[in-house]
Amino acid sequence: MSADMAAQSESGEGGDDGRADGGLGDRLVYLAVLSRPRFWLYLAGPVVVGVAAAASALADLFGLEPVALFAYFLVPANVFLYGVNDVFDADVDEANPKKDDREARWRGDPVNTVVVAASGLLGVGLFAVAPRVAWPWLAAHFFLAVEYSAPPFRFKTTPLLDSVSNGLYVLPGVAAYAAVSGSNPPMLAVAGAWLWTMGMHTFSAIPDIEPDREAGIRTTATALGERRTYWYCAATWVLAAVAFAAVDLRLGALLAAYPVVVLGIVAAGVDVDRAYWWYPVINTVVGMLITLGALWRLVNG
């Protein structure tokens, strides 16, 4: 599945107005591209980390709660999150170059709207599966997933709140930890993860600075400008590393990679449109190392 295929469909090859559907295969390709496959692990990855950190026995890794949470946050949650985003950003995205190749512009037909809404409603089933200690974290995730893009709050259009609200990405992992362990994770770990998402979100908004300014949208990145946004990201990632180091020095050392990388990007003059696509790989590697460390502890004590 490629963004090129979705782009072909949008350009009119699937229908006369560029928005008509060329069939089931075309629609599935479009929905897959809309869900940002490169970023699927941004929601599902924290679930894996949370489950591994909370497990006290190998059987805990494969219970109903962790499997259901991982399955939902791998694909349906991404269809919902990015679908809501694209619905309310349709006008802005007309001028966004990211939508030309790697992402898809919103097709406003009823079937796609129903699929996005159904993906959100599917998440309600998690409340029947997860214990009550996980409910507040799940509720917070769904609230932020909607209100980040949708009125009345539309956090993404308010500097700083757009950054802070992206804690929604770690909340599935917090919910998973709570579901498996029956208690909440260390709050310093939650704070560190939240700061990490603030940096990630604001870094990812750098390529959107000009399209957002042209559309009159104010974000942390548009308020700061490209250069100062790099420093903002570095600062949030340093604080994230400090918070994680207070939980475990090894975690702090891993998170220290983020400010080092962003400072390297600035020093080397790497184009942000190129560096933007490095972070899914970096996040996957860091998340994998944290998970493997937790599994090592689980197996070896």
Curated annotation (Swiss-Prot):
Membrane topology: Multi-pass membrane protein
Keywords, in A-Z order: Carotenoid biosynthesis, Cell membrane, Membrane, Transferase, Transmembrane, Transmembrane helix
Name of this chain's protein: Lycopene elongase/hydratase
Compartments, as annotated in UniProt: Cell membrane
Residue ranges crossing the lipid bilayer per the database entry: 39-59, 61-81, 110-130, 133-153, 160-180, 186-206, 229-249, 252-272, 276-296
General remark: H.volcanii does not produce any known rhodopsins and unlike in H.salinarum, Lye is not regulated by bacterioopsin.
GO biological process, one term: carotenoid biosynthetic process
Superkingdom of the organism of origin: Archaea
EC number, as in UniProt: 2.5.1.150
Predominant location category: membrane
Cellular component per GO, a single term: plasma membrane
MF annotations from Gene Ontology: transferase activity, transferring alkyl or aryl (other than methyl) groups
UniProt-annotated stretches for the region Disordered: 1-20
CDD domains: PT_UbiA_4 (cd13966)
Chain's role: Involved in the biosynthesis of the acyclic C50 carotenoid bacterioruberin (BR). The enzyme acts at both ends of the substrate, and catalyzes the conversion of lycopene to the C(45) intermediate dihydroisopentenyldehydrorhodopin (DH-IDR) and the conversion of isopentenyldehydrorhodopin (IDR) to the C(50) carotenoid dihydrobisanhydrobacterioruberin (DH-BABR).
Pathway, per record: Carotenoid biosynthesis
Broad class of enzyme this protein falls into: transferase
Record-stated family: Belongs to the UbiA prenyltransferase family.
Catalyzed reaction equations: all-trans-lycopene + dimethylallyl diphosphate + H2O = dihydroisopentenyldehydrorhodopin + diphosphate; isopentenyldehydrorhodopin + dimethylallyl diphosphate + H2O = dihydrobisanhydrobacterioruberin + diphosphate
Matching InterPro entries: Prenyltransferase_related, UbiA_prenyltransferase, UbiA_sf
Gene of this entry: lye
